[in-house]
Every structure is written in structure tokens, then in C-alpha cells.
Swiss-Prot record:
The keyword Hydrolase does not apply. SUPFAM superfamilies: L-aspartase-like (SSF48557). GO terms for molecular function: argininosuccinate lyase activity. This is Argininosuccinate lyase. It catalyses: 2-(N(omega)-L-arginino)succinate = fumarate + L-arginine. Keywords: Amino-acid biosynthesis, Arginine biosynthesis, Cytoplasm, Lyase. It comes from Acinetobacter baumannii (strain AYE). Pathway: Amino-acid biosynthesis; L-arginine biosynthesis; L-arginine from L-ornithine and carbamoyl phosphate: step 3/3. Belongs to the lyase 1 family. Argininosuccinate lyase subfamily. CDD domains: Argininosuccinate_lyase (cd01359). Its EC number is 4.3.2.1.
């Protein structure tokens, strides 16, 4: 994500910074100024920085540190700066290091000495921690909206395929028949847990560090609860050292994002397999695919392939943040400037991947007959035959061996169990009678028999879809 404002001016002036010039006897090296600047990427949360400053100024006026006139000048100036940024006329300066000082400097240019009073009672340490939390909270809400859209798309597709039979797999080998709707509901369940994790993460993100100042708090009579209320935070941080120094909330988000991407990657892998000429289970519309520069016949599932690949970068973003934080003593350290890009990258990647999936899933077209034919291969009803014998008094292990021998015959004759004659089946057990074909060896009998909560029978899948819609209402209430 980039703002529409101008890129940072990389020319660092030959003077000490206005932020700390009194202490230093020589100018910051031009390369060091550029090397240590973060405005190239932290300008992304200018909205949150301005919102935090407006709330801070409002609170300072409430407690008497600023006059109402000073507060109004600051708010008007910040609102104008936001408009400049969004119009692309704001000049970002690298010598001002970050989003905070760029905005504060411009504010002072516009309203004079009152602009220099804005930073009273706060530090960039608690300011940036607040900005990140505000920004991440907004992004979590957007991502939750995309998750909801994808989940609804899955339920819609599942509802159309309650009776569509396909092979279920273990070890990527045919195992038992399931319905396509049931398979899609498995994806849905993964995303429900992802939603719950993200919502839980949001609770810890939504704590306000502002007021912690550099590390020990401030001597001014601030009203943190009032500022938190203005910014929509549920509570304030309890310890100033912790508030300015830890980024575990960002790590937690990246962990939740990694799990989302892991699930999307698994779904992508299945879609890639299913669209191959060897499976042909589903068709992805052309708008989500690309071709080959040399092979005219190719239709490549680039969207799921790219999402499968992008999962790795989000995992890397998580490890980057963990590694960044693991060796830091309290409180704030410059290391933490490196927290933003791994967080931003994870946010952007998850958002883009969910957008692509939310658009693509409802457009999938299953090849119903091909799925059914595939379920007829690989002896998918073998377990049902074993269960049939158990119900007639055979111990399960003995039934397992009997059916294994029947499968061996089927392999030798290149026939499914349902294609063997009754006489052939009875050579393995005289308990097998003509009803075996209707009760155990048809695909419909197999899926219908699994008629319990969590099972693949069409009746249960319909009930699960109904429950899922209610769960979504509760999740996103």
C-alpha cells in the first residue's frame, strides 16, 4: 500500500535534527540520516498518526495543558495536513526521519509555535506504538470482512453440492466417498478458527499505549481513559515499559496471518490438483488463470499457485518479528523500527490472497460426473463392506481381512467391489448376500450411512450448512 503523496525527499540537510539538535555538536551524516529514516514505509499510517494526535490534543485541552483555541488550531492544522497527504501535495522529508516528525514539522509550519506544543506529554515511543495498534486494528477489521465474504462463498458453493459425490483421500489415495459440499465445509471450519484467532488477537491489539511516553510515563496530568475513549480503545496499557517496547501483538497477528495463509495454501494445493488433466474435478474460470508463452493449450491456475507460494513469505514475516524481538532489553530500542515492514507485508499478502479467494471460490464449477467416476475407482466402499460384515457378527479385524482379500481380487480383475459378482464375494464370506450391493457397495449408500453430526451424508451436510450460517451471524455480530 502506498499513499498518494509525494515520495520522500532523500536530500538530508547539513544540520542537526530539530528533534535533538541541542545535544549534538555536529550534523548527522547524510547517509546515516537516510539509513535510519523510516518515513519511506511508516507514512502508511498517517491517518492513524493524525487521529492519535487529534485525540492527544483534545485530551491536553481537557486537562488544561492546552487552551481550547490551541486545540482547535492543532485539529484544523492536522485535518489540512491529512487533506494534503491524500491530495498528493504533501512533501515527505527523509531528514525528518519518520511519519510523526514529518507531520509535526508541517503542523508547526502552518500554525506556528502552537504546533510545537502537540508533543507535550508523549514520546515517539508511545506514539508509534499507538499508531501501529490503530493501524493493525483497522486492517484486522478489513481482513475479517474478507474472511466473512470467503466463508459465505464456501457455504453457497457447498449448498449447491450437497449431493455431489467425490472421493475422499488419505495419503492422496482414494479412501472413502464424501460429498463435495462436505469437503468445502472442511475448508469453512479452518477459516472459522482463523476468524476466532484474529478476533481474539484484536482484543490484545486494542489496548492504548499512549500516555506511557518514552518509558516511564509523564509528569503531566493526562487522562488516558479519555484519550482511549476518543480513539476507540477498550482499555489502556497497564505498564509503561511494556507498552512502548513489546510488539507481541504484531507477532500474534503475523502468527494468525500465517495460519490463514497455511489454510489458503492447502486449499490452493487441492485446487491445483483438481484442475489438472489427471483429476478434472473442477474448472476455474479463465479470469483467474493465465496461459503459456510457448504452449498454446495451457491454462495455468496461477492464482492458487501464487497464493501457495505467498504463504512462505508470511511465514518469513512471522520469523522476522520473532527474531527482531528476542534479544531486546527493556524498553524501546531502534531495532523496533524494523517491526513495520514484516507486519505490513503480512497484512498486504493476507488481504490480497483472501480477496482473490473470495472472488474465485463462488465461481468454481465442479465436474460432477468426473468426481463421481473417480469415487468409483480405488475401492472407496471397502470400509462399508467391512462394516456390513461387522453388523452380521464378524469381528472387525476379521472383516478387515476378508475385505482385503476381496479387494485383491478386484485389483487382479481390474474391477471395483461393486463390479464383482455375488458369487465372487461369497467365496470370502457366506454372510455376504444380495443386499450388499444396495446397503454397502454403492456410493450413495456409503455417504448416506454417515448420518451423524460431522458426517458426510447429504442430510448432515445440509444441517451443517444451516448451522454454519448461524455461526457466521454470531461470529460477525
Amino acid at each position: 500500500m502506498t499513499t498518494s503523496s509525494n515520495p520522500p525527499n532523500s536530500a538530508a540537510p547539513n544540520q542537526t535534527s530539530g528533534m535533538w539538535g541541542g545535544r549534538f555538536s555536529e550534523a548527522t551524516d547524510a547517509f546515516v540520516a537516510e539509513f535510519t529514516a523510516s518515513v519511506q514505509f511508516d507514512q502508511r499510517f498517517y491517518k492513524q498518526d493524525i487521529a492519535g494526535s487529534i485525540a492527544h490534543a483534545t485530551m491536553l485541552a481537557k486537562v488544561g495543558v492546552l487552551t481550547e483555541a490551541e486545540r482547535d488550531d492543532i485539529i484544523e492544522g492536522l485535518s489540512t495536513i491529512r487533506a494534503e497527504i491524500e491530495a498528493g501535495t504533501f512533501e515527505w522529508r527523509i531528514d525528518l526521519e519518520d511519519v510523526h516528525m514529518n507531520i509535526e514539522s508541517r503542523l508547526t509550519q502552518r500554525i506556528g509555535i502552537t504546533g510545537k506544543k502537540l508533543h507535550t506529554g508523549r514520546s515517539r515511543n508511545d506514539q508509534v506504538a499507538t499508531d501501529i495498534r490503530l493501524y493493525l486494528r483497522d486492517e484486522i477489521d478489513d481482513i475479517l470482512g474478507l474472511l466473512e465474504r470467503l466463508q459465505k462463498g464456501l457455504l453457497g458453493l457447498a449448498a449447491k453440492n450437497v449431493n455431489t459425490i467425490m472421493p475422499g483421500f488419505t495419503h492422496l489415495q482414494t479412501a472413502q466417498p464424501v460429498t463435495f459440499g462436505h469437503h468445502l465445509l472442511a475448508w469453512f471450519e479452518m477459516l472459522v478458527r482463523d476468524t476466532e484467532r484474529l478476533q481474539d488477537c484484536r482484543k490484545r491489539v486494542n489496548r492504548m499505549p499512549l500516555g506511557s511516553a518514552a518509558l516511564a510515563g509523564t509528569t503531566y496530568p493526562i487522562d488516558r481513559a479519555y484519550t482511549a475513549e476518543l480513539l476507540g480503545f477498550e482499555a489502556v496499557s497497564e505498564n509503561s515499559l511494556d507498552a512502548v517496547s513489546d510488539r507481541d501483538f504484531a507477532i500474534e497477528f503475523n502468527a494468525a496471518a500465517s495460519l490463514i495463509m497455511m489454510h489458503l495454501s492447502r486449499m490452493s494445493e487441492e485446487l491445483i490438483l483438481w484442475t489438472s488433466a489427471q483429476f478434472k474435478f473442477v474448472n476455474i474460470p479463465d479470469r483467474f488463470c493465465t496461459g503459456s508463452s510457448i504452449m498454446p493449450q495451457k491454462k495455468n491456475p496461477d492464482v492458487p499457485e501464487l497464493i501457495r507460494g505467498k504463504s512462505g513469505r508470511v511465514f518469513g514475516d512471522l520469523v522476522s518479528l520473532l527474531t527482531l524481538m528476542k534479544g531486546q532489553p527493556l524498553a524501546y530500542n531502534k531495532d523496533n523500527q524494523e517491526d513495520k515492514e514484516p507486519l505490513f507485508d503480512a497484512i498486504d499478502t493476507v488481504r490480497g490472497s483472501l480477496m482473490a479467494f473470495a472472488d474465485m471460490i463462488p465461481a468454481l464449477v465442479p465436474n460432477v460426473e468426473i468426481m463421481r467416476e473417480a469415487a468409483l475407482r480405488g475401492f472407496s466402499t471397502a470400509t462399508d463392506l467391512a462394516d456390513y460384515l461387522v453388523k452380521k457378527g464378524v469381528a472387525f479385524r476379521d472383516a478387515h481381512e476378508i475385505v482385503g482379500k476381496a479387494v485383491a481380487l478386484g485389483v487382479a480383475e481390474e474391477k471395483d467391489l461393486s463390479e464383482l459378482t455375488l458369487e465372487q464375494l461369497q467365496q470370502f464370506s457366506d454372510l455376504i448376500t444380495a443386499d450388499v450391493f444396495d446397503k454397502a457397495l454403492t456410493l450413495e449408500a456409503s455417504v448416506n450411512a454417515r448420518d451423524h453430526i460431522g458426517g458426510t451424508s447429504p442430510k448432515q451436510v445440509e444441517a451443517a450448512i444451516a448451522r454454519a450460517h448461524k455461526r457466521l451471524e454470531q461470529l460477525y455480530a
